[in-house]
Amino acid sequence: MLLAWVHTFLLSNMLLAEAYGSGGCFWDNGHLYREDQPSPAPGLRCLNWLAAQGSGESLAQPSPGNHNYCRNPDQDPRGPWCYISSETGVPEKRPCEDLRCPETTSQAPPPPPPSSTTELEEKFGVPGDKETQVFPPANALPARSEAAEVQPVIGISQRVRMNSKEKKDLGTLGYVLGVTMTVIIIAIGVGIVLGYTYKRGKDLKEQHEQKVCEREMQRITLPLSAFTNPTCEIMDEKTIIVHSNQTPADVQEGSTLLTDQAGTPGA
């Protein structure tokens, strides 16, 4: 269990060192210095920053913290320094010696900004003293070509406003022509609607007359049996006439009655 805690502690220290990226060093004026050196030179000892800044002379300078390591709070070009006790007992500023850290590519900071006008000229290609350029005064108005190049971007709303202002008045003749064209277009539309309505009504009327004519032709060409109802047939009645006068019958031979030949019995 103790071994696990030791591994965790060492790993956390390594992660913190990598996070700071200095490995116990700090950057100052483009150089890497050790941050835990309490001596500016052999045989000397740095005073605590808070204790050394107790005097009125050093209160105006920022305090690096509650320690006695070499720092550079006032950005001294000579590098980090610290306060030491002088012969009179007054804190004295003393630059630190042999404070450099071994610089590596991984610890190298971004390139510092150029500190002189010469470096700026070399970087951005600005001509030096050999080539002198004459600039117009600040209050001078630009030329037409320059003004056209420096014009701001015009938005949609500004374009709409400009176009509305640039409209020209067509005059009375323009208004008359506009009204005339409007009336002509309306008349053409009304004529198209009326013509379509008349044509449609005429077609419907012709279709109706054609249907009536077809029905009449069908009625004429039908047979007679189509007009009779077989359930209501009329039967012809025959009249029989009976007369009371009988015509005498011709007596033929052999057709007389037996009574005539034999006579009455007992006669």
From Swiss-Prot:
One of its GO terms (cellular component) is plasma membrane. Residues 1-21 form the signal peptide. Residues 22-172 are extracellular. It is a single-pass type I membrane protein. Residues 24-101 form the Kringle domain. It is found in: Cell membrane. InterPro entries: Kringle, Kringle-like, Kringle_CS, Kringle_sf. Residues 91-122 are annotated as: Disordered. The chain crosses the membrane at residues 173-193. Residues 194-267 are cytoplasmic. Disulfide bonds join C25-C101, C46-C82, C70-C96. Keywords: Cell membrane, Disulfide bond, Kringle, Membrane, Signal, Transmembrane, Transmembrane helix. Its main location: membrane. One of its GO terms (molecular function) is endopeptidase activity. Negative regulator of hepatic phosphatidylinositol 3-kinase (PI3K) activity. This is Phosphoinositide-3-kinase-interacting protein 1. It comes from Rattus norvegicus. The gene is Pik3ip1.
